Amino acid sequence: MQLSDFDFELPEELIAQEPIKQRDQSRLMIVHRDIDRTEHKTFKDLLQYLQPGDVLVMNDSKVLPARIYGEKVSTGAKIEVLLLRQISANQWETLVKPGKRAKIGEILDFGSGKMKGKIVDHTDVGGRVIEFSCQEPFLQVLEQIGSMPLPPYIKKPLTDKQRYQTVYARQEGSAAAPTAGLHFTRELLEEIRNRGVSIVTVLLHVGLGTFRPVQVEDVTSHRMHEEYYEITPQAAEEINQAKLRGGRVIAVGTTSVRCLETSSNEAGQVLPGSGFTDIFIYPGYQFKVIEGLVTNFHLPKSSLLMLISALAGREKILKAYQQAVTEQYRFFSFGDAMLII
């Protein structure tokens, strides 16, 4: 299985640079797994494809305003820091620009004295471990001085931070949004519940590795980055009970899929727990839990495109993507959505 098997031509103008005005008015392509049929709808029409007894599983991770700008105390030189992962109470794994000048022991100032940072170590991938200190709670200060770490393909500044958060985001820790969830409004979620569909949340903190392209030609040699996940006993019980009653498990986003498939046993039961997952799902993988997926349109040659190809078939997905290009769907984080059922 070669990397080139997951390539497609995407005109740059189809990469969405900003969210549409109303979350649930984005377009929705329906891809049927068992028949050769696609449909073109509006996201709000998702309701028509859900049945009483189904369970919709969402990732309630919240994006941190993880990009902070500061300066070196010693020289006043400007510096940019991107928070990747919390290691301990005060220490974070980060990426620093310019990295070559970020030496161990260097003291950094952010927000005109609101936060200080000390570089204490290097990381395996060329980053830095920074120990932060501030008078107010760390996350509170971060909200004041940080900006959203938008993906590199989005060039337009974000005017409203909340548009890069899902309406149900609860647990801070992601460096990128679980973007399939951006289409849901509180009103649509209420309509889904009223239809007899359960909504269950799990947690997977999205790392920046989600944007890293696969760089090996032999796909099976690719290694995923680790991400923290958590499934509560209550969430596992609700999902397992729904399956026992014959309900379908439909994941919202590839992060929810990775969380569920990591936490399941061979019988397809979801087990509660937490830890780090580097599960890599590509064609040939046998899904144990999910039967459907709400997802966005992904980058060529990406691990996310491979995951949805594992669910619906590579040829079917690439054919659907060609349709999406022809029909001028909007791609990537702020783009349109696909339902695979």
Swiss-Prot record:
Coiled coil: none annotated. This is S-adenosylmethionine:tRNA ribosyltransferase-isomerase. Signal peptide: none annotated. The lineage of its organism: Bacteria, Bacillati, Bacillota, Clostridia, Eubacteriales. The gene is queA. One of its GO terms (biological process) is tRNA wobble guanine modification. It is found in: Cytoplasm. Monomer. GO terms for molecular function: S-adenosylmethionine:tRNA ribosyltransferase-isomerase activity. Transfers and isomerizes the ribose moiety from AdoMet to the 7-aminomethyl group of 7-deazaguanine (preQ1-tRNA) to give epoxyqueuosine (oQ-tRNA). Pathway: tRNA modification; tRNA-queuosine biosynthesis. It comes from Desulforamulus reducens (strain ATCC BAA-1160 / DSM 100696 / MI-1) (Desulfotomaculum reducens).
